[in-house]
Amino acid sequence: MMRAVWEALAALAAVACLVGAVRGGPGLSMFAGQAAQPDPCSDENGHPRRCIPDFVNAAFGKDVRVSSTCGRPPARYCVVSERGEERLRSCHLCNSSDPKKAHPPAFLTDLNNPHNLTCWQSENYLQFPHNVTLTLSLGKKFEVTYVSLQFCSPRPESMAIYKSMDYGRTWVPFQFYSTQCRKMYNRPHRAPITKQNEQEAVCTDSHTDMRPLSGGLIAFSTLDGRPSAHDFDNSPVLQDWVTATDIRVAFSRLHTFGDENEDDSELARDSYYYAVSDLQVGGRCKCNGHAARCVRDRDDSLVCDCRHNTAGPECDRCKPFHYDRPWQRATAREANECVACNCNLHARRCRFNMELYKLSGRKSGGVCLNCRHNTAGRHCHYCKEGFYRDMGKPITHRKACKACDCHPVGAAGKTCNQTTGQCPCKDGVTGITCNRCAKGYQQSRSPIAPCIKIPVAPPTTAASSMEEPEDCDSYCKASKGKLKMNMKKYCRKDYAVQIHILKADKAGDWWKFTVNIISVYKQGTSRIRRGDQSLWIRSRDIAXKCPKIKPLKKYLLLGNAEDSPDQSGIVADKSXLVIQWRDTWARRXRKFQQREKKGKCKKA
């Protein structure tokens, strides 16, 4: 009963699709027509919704490649009719060069007029194992509802329908018809269809009767009997099953009366051929619910007019920059439109990341690429290193990020606070870009410590806070004139440095001077580096002015290595040579330094 219903349905659809009035059955819910809407892909509120192209006869007007056509050369064929038990034959000439007597493949897909049938016809008696094939290219992927053939000759005894999803490169069976399924196609007869095999072709003996001798119909419904047809939206298996780019019909064996081997077999054999008046493939352009029509592109190829931010011939991918969630087919419940990446107008490209999508609760997985306008981050939502947010402009503004402009000497790095723009300043440096010394600090010539504390100088020297010992003259002899430095003195000392006295502090039996070492001319085994260090001198040496030094002055200091109280400073005593700095010392000290490298100190 069900097969009869489907056969009648397919026949009605074949006629109705020519005038655009096809109605689907219960198993064809995916092909249900839509009422005319201003925008089929959006609802009355402008929200996306599933839309599908019109149902059409995809074969209409298309070329069909056939393996056999009568009339080349002209040949006789006979039409069999029955009057009671008597068979009558009316013979004619098939001649491809005469339009009135030709039966070309174009008649398969022309307008089917029941009152003026046009029939394609094969050569006579191409019997098994020879077959005749009809191959139809649909031009793009379609979701096929049915394939129907109306015959001018008796229907074949065995016939197969195939489909291709890759434009004819490979073929898979769609349906088999035969009274001997196992012998002809190695298939069981009317095998039950379950969810496990609903994507497989079955073989049936329906539609294989020889009668009627003309006008018989074979109609194959792609979803008839498939268990998941009622839930097509959620069945990728059936969505794939109904998809085709090409359809092929293979006629495998003719029906005969068994008289082809009798004495008048030539006349009988001229009565056996395949003739079809109409080939129809009912279905819709496959657009996955994201287009309401198919159009011709610049290459004259048939493609979907994609909506919902989708792209591709079948709207089977998201269009560029709309990768915030994965592509999905539209359903009756959800349009599943593609969503643009959120890049705050600072990027033109993005990619999809499944891990981020899952972590977001399946809401957002887009990652922006090549953020512009000095922005960075997954959404180009913060400023890149070396820039900070201008809070007076929205993040979408081209100039939302301003350069830090951190001072190359005063700042400890090139990055700044993303909110305030404050650069990280070195000790004693202040300002949003670290471009000036803080209160209580003064500028130095050192790029390492550009600002140093202003020392609080004692009234005269450090020795003023301590009475001069009575035996000072016997302890050391303070210099009372200009000191001279020569190569011999240079070589006798362990270190030679240019220092700037910053401040002095009493520390028990010692005076601790904070000095800035400007240049190192000799260091021996001492680990003396440029920058701020401690200079330790015993209180007795200071009291006896051996050596005599004053804060805020610059000196050339030559001394011997000795352990200091803090293990990181240098020590000077009465034997040290302390000379007030003059710029000429720099040239002389470098000269001594070069001679030392040449081994002159050993000779001295």
Curated annotation (Swiss-Prot):
Q: What PROSITE patterns does UniProt report for this protein, alphabetically?
A: EGF_1, EGF_LAM_1, EGF_LAM_2, LAMININ_NTER, NTR
- Keyword DNA-binding included in the entry's annotation: no
Q: Carbohydrate attachment sites?
A: 95, 116, 131, 417
Domain Laminin N-terminal intervals: 47-284
Q: Laminin EGF-like domain: from which residue to which, for each copy? A: 285-340, 341-403, 404-453
Query: SMART domains per the record?
Result: C345C, EGF_Lam, LamNT
Q: Does the keyword Iron apply?
A: no
From the record, give the cysteines joined by S-S bonds: 119-152, 285-294, 287-304, 306-315, 318-338, 341-350, 343-368, 371-380, 383-401, 404-416, 406-423, 425-434, 437-451, 472-544, 491-601
Instruction: Please classify the protein's predominant subcellular localization into one broad category.
Output: secreted
Signal sequence, start to end: 1-24
Name the Gene3D superfamilies on file.
Answer: 2.40.50.120, Galactose-binding domain-like, Laminin
Keyword field: Apoptosis, Cytoplasm, Disulfide bond, Glycoprotein, Laminin EGF-like domain, Repeat, Secreted, Signal
Q: Which InterPro entries match?
A: Galactose-bd-like_sf (IPR008979), Laminin/Netrin_ECM (IPR050440), Laminin_N (IPR008211), LE_dom (IPR002049), LMN_ATRN_NET-like_EGF (IPR056863), Netrin_domain (IPR001134), Netrin_module_non-TIMP (IPR018933), TIMP-like_OB-fold (IPR008993)
Function as written in the Swiss-Prot or TrEMBL entry: Netrins control guidance of CNS commissural axons and peripheral motor axons. Its association with either DCC or some UNC5 receptors will lead to axon attraction or repulsion, respectively. Binding to UNC5C might cause dissociation of UNC5C from polymerized TUBB3 in microtubules and thereby lead to increased microtubule dynamics and axon repulsion. Involved in dorsal root ganglion axon projection towards the spinal cord. It also serves as a survival factor via its association with its receptors which prevent the initiation of apoptosis.
Q: What is the protein name given in its UniProt record?
A: Netrin-1
Which source organism does the UniProt entry give? Rattus norvegicus (Rat)
